Amino acid sequence: YLRDFIAIIVIFFLSLFVEQVLLQWNSFKNEKYEQTFQVSEVQKAENKDGETTYDFLFDGRYVSSIYLIYQSKTDISSRMKVTFYDGYGQKEVMELEDTASFLLGKSAVWVDQKVDSLKLTVENKDADKLNSIIFVNHTVFSWAKFLLVFSVLLLSYLFVSHCTFFGKRPEWMYAMVSVALGTVIILSAHHSFDSWDEQIHYNIAYTDSWVWNYMEYSDAVMSNVEMRVPTGDTLEEEQWIGEWLNQANDTVVLSSQKGRFLRYGQRAYLPQILGLGLGRTLGLSYVATVFLGKFFNLLFCTAVVTCAIRFSKYGKRTLMCVGLLPTTVFLFSSFTYDAFVIALLMLGIALFVTEYLSEEKIQTKRTMVSILAMVVGCFSKAVYIPFLALYWLMPKDKFYSRRQKNLFKAGIFVLLILMFASFILPLIGNVTSGAEVGDYRGGDTSQTSQLSMILGYPLTYTGVLLKSLGTTLDRKSVV
């Protein structure tokens, strides 16, 4: 244990060295400074294309980034022509483009060169909105890069020095890799929602994270839900966006009443709900609370898949590969119900395969856990309900008697009917009442109208369906 402790300490400081020194070597080895030029004191020229160009003369020092400081009610687009010295001391020119969000009031452009001069071009209407431009050289700490380096070094050390243990317990290998990769993904995403319909899933999880029947929406929450959060191109901009979100979270723009009951279709958000609720209860910043919501989802889904690998007697490597697929880890690290569904179905199917292939009689505990995992996993994705029918394939020699077999399969049939009824009956009720129910993720789809059309024009619908299937199965359309 002492050796492992010393190794962890060494790897920690080595990771800091790599992130702060090696990955930012040019910034580290050159002088640290910050020099400001007021735009009003700089020579400018207007051209016939309706643009204004500012000329900035510099002294050839290394510049890591250039900051634009402005006050505007609209985004500002700019072009930069940077004259710099290459490794041979010769002058070269590179052109950069930037779009600055009016919400931040400043923008950062990565340069990474020894700058001789700069030509900054903006539209005439934006010229009077620029206040100053700042040439800087400094290192910027990145949690994502640090954690990536730390995880690679630490996991490599552990897997090599404790290969016997991880060879016998592959589930722990999976758990450590999944949590490490998922956390890096969460930190790399910064403040953007990159998964499919993630802003809608976040809205549902945030709403349900309020325990009582009262909830508040801050400006930061509404900005995420309405996709109004600025996007950053540099680490500095991402830090500024985080500060802006934390400040915007102090402004409440909407408060309303909500139901206390969590619908069964939304129970897949429980890990995210717990993370968001805990962060708000502890008084964490908005950015940290959102991170906690994603992180709890990652922990829960990783724990479920870890259990699937642990208790499965067959296909452990296959489960590990599926659990570490890029899309799987990405979903585990996002606001979505798909991660919850995938993890529980993996557990349910893994236990079913173990039960099916084992030579012993059916194990009640293992079977019940498998069925429960499938049922809960299908709450938000009814399309996976037929997976329960797999238990009809259970061989007769798995049961102690014919009566036990019949009761078991009858119970599975009843469970299937109940699961199908849980979403079919409400849909039929909406059709008979004329209520319009669509996809809660948005769009113009209407489940009610679609089902009404099918029931009202069965022959026409059958023709459309067959034509669509024929087109899909046509050899010319298959890639």
What are the roles of these predicted feature ranges?
Residues 250, 426-479:
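Membrane-lumen/periplasm interface segments of multi-pass, membrane-embedded glycan/lipid transferases
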Residues 1-24, 140-185, 407-415:
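Start-transfer (signal-anchor) and selected internal transmembrane alpha helices
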Residues 161, 291-314:
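Transmembrane-helix motifs of polytopic, lipid-linked glycan transferases
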Residues 352-361, 385-419:
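Perimembrane helix-loop-helix junctions
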Residues 210-291:
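Interfacial juxtamembrane loops and adjacent helix segments
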Residues 330, 366-382, 387-393:
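Membrane-interface alpha helices of multi-pass inner-membrane proteins
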